[in-house]
Curated annotation (Swiss-Prot):
Signal peptide: none annotated. The record marks 373 as: Required for activity. It is an enzyme of class 7 (translocase). F-type ATPases have 2 components, CF(1) - the catalytic core - and CF(0) - the membrane proton channel. CF(1) has five subunits: alpha(3), beta(3), gamma(1), delta(1), epsilon(1). CF(0) has three main subunits: a(1), b(2) and c(9-12). The alpha and beta chains form an alternating ring which encloses part of the gamma chain. CF(1) is attached to CF(0) by a central stalk formed by the gamma and epsilon chains, while a peripheral stalk is formed by the delta and b chains. Its main location: membrane. It is a peripheral membrane protein. SUPFAM superfamilies: C-terminal domain of alpha and beta subunits of F1 ATP synthase, N-terminal domain of alpha and beta subunits of F1 ATP synthase, P-loop containing nucleoside triphosphate hydrolases. The keyword Coiled coil does not apply. ATP binds at residues 169-176. It comes from Burkholderia lata (strain ATCC 17760 / DSM 23089 / LMG 22485 / NCIMB 9086 / R18194 / 383). This is ATP synthase subunit alpha. It catalyses: ATP + H2O + 4 H(+)(in) = ADP + phosphate + 5 H(+)(out). Keywords: ATP synthesis, ATP-binding, Cell inner membrane, Cell membrane, CF(1), Hydrogen ion transport, Ion transport, Membrane, Nucleotide-binding, Translocase, Transport.
Length: 513
């Protein structure tokens, strides 16, 4: 069949007129491979680092590797239905999670989707999970305390609002217990808590949530869970999602506390993603930017000035500074704190609480090693009464540890050395504390006062904790006004000190312990 040129031109003209051109300017590419949640895409020429990508079946991914002729992306969620040849579209957006007071009391995943079976989270706002930390100009120095209710921490390693304090130790030595006690102790203290569980067993996360509900702590807590059964991408993103939720409160002049339990598992997840993306491995097979992974997260915890809050809220909130306090947890292997991730996080944070398996097994719980645990900025935030009384405790313990090592070799000890050893044993006993029983400021002050002034020296070591408990009960019944004054002023005046001394002496004479 022969077509003349006029017929061809007519045919082309009719085809052009019948063409329906859609105004979809989004860039798109094709999947060339899918392995372990990592997708290689060809043809996405106009894509940003960290941009959300849309896959078939309402599935989204995150662009992480931008190479010359392909893009490496990680899938958020299930990826079994994605196959070679599928069309991928750019969205022009970066990953956001819901934020706001609607999340308080809920358990959500790394993307802010509820997983507690209590219906949808009706959050009105969303915010980007990757944000730049406030600059130096907008920050304030740490000056208000975060009371953990744990004697050894509040006395020797105090934490302030806006601080980053690392909790580090081997597995099964009480790291999560310390973090949970800190959350439980915030009841009535106007502090929103966020607990980010990374790479833990789902049953362990459930136990944490149950305990928080039993103690009434879920009323002011958000739980962000990326369990061991979730993908590496979810475990990598969970801390950033939790941090964004905490920043909502910080930027509006409120105080928040965030616990990352634990960042070792996040580093493992990031290492897995990086190796699958074929990024060059470095020390311990971690990628080169594993320091930046944690520094950009922990730098977002800060105390921000009143000017910052006023500017952020467009003048709605005035005269209020906000804070986000971070307690990252790091798990060590056989006590090795010189490994890559522990040394990185130690250098980023404002101090660390070392927990030791040997102390834990010896029955000293919380198993805090007072000698190497420090708080670089928390001293300025300590309450007056605790600051006044805690100096002696740290010295007693440090001298006791030193002398105890020598005492093993010496057979005859002089009187002063023996007294110091005896005092040290009693202080060590006094700092033991059962889980889920955080103390108020006045209770800590009374215990420290009794230890500093020698009221425990003539007791048997086994009687120390029963004496402490009995003394607290006695003060509650007969000296309620004294307790109220200490709790209100957070200080111990000369008159109150005299009243406390006589109360302790009369209780000791009664022998009711």
């Amino acid at each position: 069949m022969q077509l003349n040129p006029s017929e061809i031109s007519e045919l082309i003209k009719s085809r052009i007129q019948g063409l329906e051109a859609s105004a979809d300017v989004r860039n798109q590419g094709t999947v060339i491979s899918v392995t372990d949640g990592i997708v290689r895409i060809h043809g996405l020429s106009d894509v940003m680092q960290g941009e959300m990508l849309e896959f078939p079946g309402n599935t989204f991914g995150l662009a992480l590797n931008l190479e010359r002729d392909s893009v490496g992306a990680v899938i958020l969620g299930e990826y079994e239905h994605i196959s070679e040849g599928d069309i991928v579209k750019t969205t022009g957006r970066i990953l956001e999670v819901p934020v706001g007071p609607e999340l308080v009391g809920r358990v959500v995943d790394a993307l802010g989707n509820p997983i507690d079976g209590k219906g949808p989270v009706n959050a009105k706002l969303t915010d980007a999970i990757e944000k730049i930390a406030p600059g130096v100009i907008w920050r304030k120095s740490v000056s208000q305390p975060v009371q953990t209710g744990i004697k050894s921490i509040d006395a020797m390693v105090p934490i302030g609002r806006g601080q980053r304090e690392l909790i580090i130790g081997d597995r099964q030595c009480g790291k999560t217990a310390v973090a949970l006690d800190a959350i439980i102790n915030q009841k009535g203290k106007d502090l929103i808590c966020i607990y980010v569980a990374i790479g833990q067993k789902a049953s362990s996360i459930m136990n944490v949530v149950r305990k928080l509900e039993e103690t009434g702590a879920m009323e002011y807590t958000i739980v962000v869970a990326a369990s061991a059964s979730d993908s590496a991408a979810m475990q990598y993103l969970a801390p950033y999602a939790g941090c964004t939720m905490g920043e909502y409160f910080r930027d509006r002049g409120q105080d928040a506390l965030i616990i990352y339990d634990d960042l070792t598992k996040q580093a493992w997840a990031y290492r897995q993603i990086s190796l699958l993306l074929r990024r060059p491995p470095g020390r311990e097979a971690y990628p080169g930017d594993v320091f930046y992974l944690h520094s950009r997260l922990l730098e977002r915890a800060a105390r921000v000035s009143e000017e910052y809050v006023e500017k952020f809220t467009n003048g709605e909130v005035k005269g209020k500074s906000g804070s986000l306090t971070a307690l990252p947890v790091i798990e060590t292997q056989a006590g090795d704190v010189t490994a890559f991730v522990p040394t990185n996080v130690i250098s980023i944070t404002d101090g660390q609480i070392f927990l030791e398996t040997d102390l834990f097994n010896a029955g000293i719980r919380p198993a805090i090693n007072a000698g190497v645990s420090v708080s670089r900025v928390g001293g300025a935030a300590q309450t007056k009464v605790v600051k006044k009384l805690s100096g002696g405790i740290r010295t007693d313990l440090a001298q006791y540890r030193e002398l105890a090592a020598f005492a093993q070799f010496a057979s005859d000890l002089d009187e002063a050395t023996r007294k110091q050893l005896e005092r040290g044993r009693r202080v060590t006993e006094l700092l033991k504390q059962p889980q889920y029983q955080p103390l108020q400021v006045w209770e800590l002050a009374v215990s420290l006062y009794a230890a500093n002034n020698g009221y425990l020296d003539d007791l048997d070591v086994k009687q120390v904790l029963s004496f402490e408990k009995g003394l607290r009960e006695s003060l509650k019944t007969s000296n309620a006004d004294l307790i109220k004054r200490i709790e209100d002023t957070k200080d111990l005046s000369k008159d109150d000190e005299g009243a406390l001394r006589s109360a302790i002496e009369s209780f000791k004479k009664s022998g009711a312990y």
